[in-house]
């Protein structure tokens, strides 16, 4: 199981780093911060599918 620790999120501003992650909603998130903010916004319904683009 792949997992990302989102305990420090949400954050008001994300960097522009490009290290894509694929969410369980089949959306490619550009980096961990953007992904974790989406996870928090979704109340945990979005999870990490895999690292890299969907």
Swiss-Prot record:
InterPro entries per UniProt:
Bifunctional_prot_inhibitor (IPR051597), Kazal_dom (IPR002350), Kazal_dom_sf (IPR036058), Prot_inh_Kazal-m (IPR001239)
Entry keyword RNA-binding: no
The superkingdom listed in its UniProt entry is Eukaryota
Gene3D superfamilies for the chain: 3.30.60.30
Report residues carrying sugar chains.
43
Q: Which Pfam families did the record assign?
A: Kazal_1 (PF00050)
Instruction: List localization entries.
Output: Secreted
Which keywords does this chain's UniProt record carry? Disulfide bond, Glycoprotein, Protease inhibitor, Repeat, Secreted, Serine protease inhibitor
Q: Cystine bridges: which residues?
A: 6-36, 14-33, 22-54
| Residue ranges annotated for the Kazal-like domain, each copy included | 4-54
Record CDD domains: KAZAL_FS (cd00104)
Q: Is the keyword Repeat in the record?
A: yes
SUPFAM superfamilies, alphabetized: Kazal-type serine protease inhibitors
**Any one GO molecular-function label of the UniProt entry:** serine-type endopeptidase inhibitor activity
Domain comment as written in the entry: Avian ovomucoid consists of three homologous, tandem Kazal family inhibitory domains.
Q: Which named protein is this?
A: Ovomucoid
Which organism's genome codes for this protein?
Haemorhous mexicanus
